[in-house]
Regions:
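Amphipathic alpha-helical scaffolding segments comprising HEAT/armadillo-like alpha-solenoid repeats
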Residues: 447-457, 478-490, 505-514, 534-547, ...
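Structural signature of tandem alpha-helical TPR/SEL1-like repeats
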Residues: 479-480, 535-546, 569-581, 602-615, ...
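Primarily the internal scaffold of c-type cytochrome electron-transfer domains
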Residues: 22-33, 44, 52-118, 122-130, ...
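Helix-start (N-cap) detector for alpha-helical repeat units in TPR-like alpha-solenoids
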Residues: 495, 518, 556-557, 590-591, ...
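Residue-level detector of extended alpha-helical repeat arrays and alpha-solenoid scaffolds
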Residues: 466, 498, 521-522
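Structural marker of alpha-solenoid helical repeat scaffolds
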Residues: 476, 492, 515, 551, ...
Length: 696
């Protein structure tokens, strides 16, 4: 048996063998008795036979994803340094007993540092929260610059929201639920993690089998060692490329977690819902990352993902580094030099010397600089985009999508870059790509046009984009054309497309509650929740929906889902309690106030509903839906002047807001202002989408 070179991996061995406080008091309960009683960490048992793989892994970022505090590694950042962040001063010191301390002037508390995330280019230190979970302060240690910094120092989200800080009590404040490690980080920084949240006590009792992303996160354990001594059952040792990719995607994706029971070999879509470009500010309308979006969405939206390219085509599974260098384009040329067939598609043959207008050997001549530009995560961690778009300066000027040309040519503008692109690639910009980007851009800006979206859908063959366009169509005023497109999509082979179709179809999607994939069943179930409550045949669907909501109940979205379930089941008191709980978890959530207001309005409590809608418009003054709903409630209260003002504000924020214009026209008609009402209806007809009235 080959021996592991312990001196080369000693730090990782020590990390595996150390048993942190979280594991002592919160034992992992999801493992078989054999592994729970094992005295030697499983990954070290793997190393006995798989020496090379273990040593490769020991030097990877996966191995260092989570660990306990180590005085030798962590003393430098805790020598009295100070950092001003979000109205508070943070001070980092070391106690006499050797504990690392974080002092927060805002809460006037000293926190003992519990554990550590990552190792480069930044390190995050976790502290214990009041809810039994761990929290990630907004301060992180820059390994290269050797200093503390605020991870939100250049956060576009804060500027979009009109705020410069994350205040105490906010969901996104570091002591809030948005920065709770157990809910937001732990699945991807430990192996075999279980959240174990107790909603009644509002406390976490989480557990994990091993710190970091270890062997057992990517290789499925057998119930006991096999006859050959291997810890992985013979039938589980060979996985398909898609199964391995789905395992990577559980962490390298911006996604909604439906449960924490994923094991290697499962489908991603049975446990997670992938985030698509359907919410403003999250992705650019061409699918490029705008926020911290990770890799999976971009890849699923790309032609390469459509062809069958997966993570392991480019990345080594154990070192987690690239298989070939990117600097000389050898990684990309591995396929694009000879037209390698991936799946059933031949890669386009590319000659780097003639393909780019940039000089050979320059930074701009690297494939990744144009097709995978970097964006900063946590302010100082540059990560590459995986949507594999081509620079289109014309679209950049029109829609704001990133223009990679200007990353190097900072003294130039979009017009200059557009001229270069037009000269070099006179006929290579696909009309379909531009039409789709414009359609998504208009929809995200609240100016969606049904015909534009339908045309883009009809021309699209990438499943991720088909799902995106259907999701955006589901938010439009429904027409027979939309319904026909959604009915056809119900039979699509891709689960994301079927789930999007369910959201557009409503009651017609009821048969999809029996779909083999969870994201589809879940989408169809929410559209038919009242049917589920009253149908014994739908008991399984209702139980699954309830389990998802309970799993997410530590977050405001989960509380709102529980509220809707309780409401559908006629439990008004429970529903109201959950709406209030959602607001307490995120006092700045416009959606929570809005949904609560709708709930109250339907129970003939218009004054209470009015107060919640005023709260909604206060926290989200740029949200047209909020002012629209406010206008409906004011009209119900016969405050017609104020109602018109609210509807006007909604239309000012979104001139193509069909429902707002329709209801304004109806209100003007009610007030006897017929010419003004007729003018509004003419404007509405010009939008070419017949409206339907909406009640609050």
């Amino acid at each position: 048996m080959t021996q592991v070179k312990k001196w080369s991996v000693l730090p990782v061995i020590l990390l595996l063998c150390s048993c942190d406080e979280g594991q002592k008091v919160k034992p992992y309960t999801g493992q078989s008795a054999h592994w729970q009683q094992s005295a030697v960490p499983i990954s070290l048992q793997c190393a006995a036979c798989h020496t090379k793989e273990f040593e490769d892994w020991a030097g990877s970022d996966h191995a260092w994803a989570y660990r306990t505090v180590n005085p030798e590694l962590d003393s430098e950042p805790f020598h009295g340094q100070r950092l001003q962040a979000h109205g508070s001063e943070l001070r980092f010191t070391t106690a006499r007993e050797g504990h690392l301390l974080l002092a927060d002037s805002e809460s006037k508390r000293n926190f003992t540092v519990h554990s550590v995330l990552g190792r480069r280019p930044l390190v995050q230190y976790l502290v214990q929260g009041k809810d039994g979970g761990l929290h990630t302060p907004s301060a992180a240690w820059d390994v290269t610059r050797r200093g503390w910094f605020d991870m939100f120092e250049a956060d576009e989200r804060l500027s979009r929201e009109g705020s410069a800080t994350r205040n105490a009590g906010d969901w996104g404040h570091w002591q809030g639920r948005g920065m709770n490690w157990n809910s937001q980080c732990a699945w991807c920084h430990t192996s075999h993690f279980l959240k174990n949240y107790d909603a009644t006590a509002d406390r976490y009792n989480s557990g994990w089998k091993e710190p970091g992303v270890t062997c057992i996160q990517c290789h499925k354990l057998s119930a006991a060692p096999s006859a050959d001594g291997c810890l992985v059952a013979p039938g589980e040792r060979t996985l398909s490329a898609q199964q391995m990719h789905d395992n990577c995607a559980t962490c390298h994706a911006r996604r909604e977690e439906l449960d924490d029971s994923f094991v290697v070999g499962d489908k991603f879509d049975d446990h997670f819902r992938l985030e698509l470009p359907i919410i403003p500010g999250i992705f650019w309308p061409n699918g490029m990352q705008r926020d911290e979006d990770y890799c999976e969405t971009g890849l699923r939206l790309s032609r390469m993902g459509r062809a069958g390219v997966t993570c392991l085509d480019c990345h080594d599974p154990h070192t987690a580094t690239l298989k070939l260098p990117q600097e000389d384009n050898s990684l990309c040329m591995r396929c694009h030099a000879t037209g390698t067939v991936v799946g059933s598609t031949a890669s386009p043959v590319i000659d780097p010397a003639t393909h780019t207008p940039c000089p050979t050997g320059s930074k701009g001549a690297r494939c990744v600089e144009c097709h995978m530009p970097e964006s900063p995560y946590m302010a100082r961690d540059p990560r590459r985009d995986h949507s594999f778009n081509s620079p289109d300066p014309e679209l950049s000027a029109e829609t704001g999508v990133p223009n990679a040309c200007l990353n190097c040519h900072k003294d130039k503008d979009h017009a200059w870059a557009a001229g270069v692109v037009a000269q070099k690639y006179p006929a290579q910009k696909a009309a379909r790509y531009r039409a789709r980007t414009r359609a998504v851009h208009h929809a995200l800006a609240g100016e969606g046009n049904t015909q534009e979206l339908l045309a883009a859908l009809a021309a699209e063959d990438v499943p991720g984009w088909r799902a995106t366009l259907l999701e955006l169509l589901a938010r439009q005023e429904q027409t027979e054309e939309i319904q026909q497109a959604a009915r056809a999509a119900m039979k699509d082979e891709n689960a994301m497309v079927r789930a999007a179709a369910a959201r557009a179809l409503g009651e017609e999607a009821l048969p999809l509650i029996h779909d083999p994939v969870k994201i589809v069943r879940r989408a169809a179930a929410w559209q038919n929740i009242r049917h589920l409550v009253n149908s014994p045949q739908a008991a399984d669907a209702l139980a699954e929906l309830t389990a998802i909501a309970r799993h997410q109940s530590d977050q405001p979205t989960g509380a709102m889902l529980l509220a809707m379930l309780a409401d559908a089941q006629g439990n008004t008191a429970e529903a109201e309690q959950q709406y209030k709980r959602a607001i307490s978890l995120d006092p700045a959530s416009a959606v929570a106030y809005m949904d609560y207001a709708v709930f109250l309005a339907r129970r003939n409590r218009p004054m209470d509903a009015l107060q919640q809608m005023l709260n909604c418009t206060r926290v989200a003054p740029q949200n047209p839906e909020g002012f629209y709903r406010l206008g409906l409630i004011l009209a119900e209260l016969q405050q017609y002047g104020y109602a018109l003002s609210a509807l006007d504000k909604a239309l000012q924020l979104s001139p193509t807001f069909h429902r707002a214009r329709y209801n304004k026209a109806m209100l003007l008609q009610h007030l006897g202002r017929h010419q003004e009402a007729q003018k509004e209806m003419e404007l509405l007809r010009a939008l070419q989408t017949p409206p339907t009235p909406t009640q609050p």
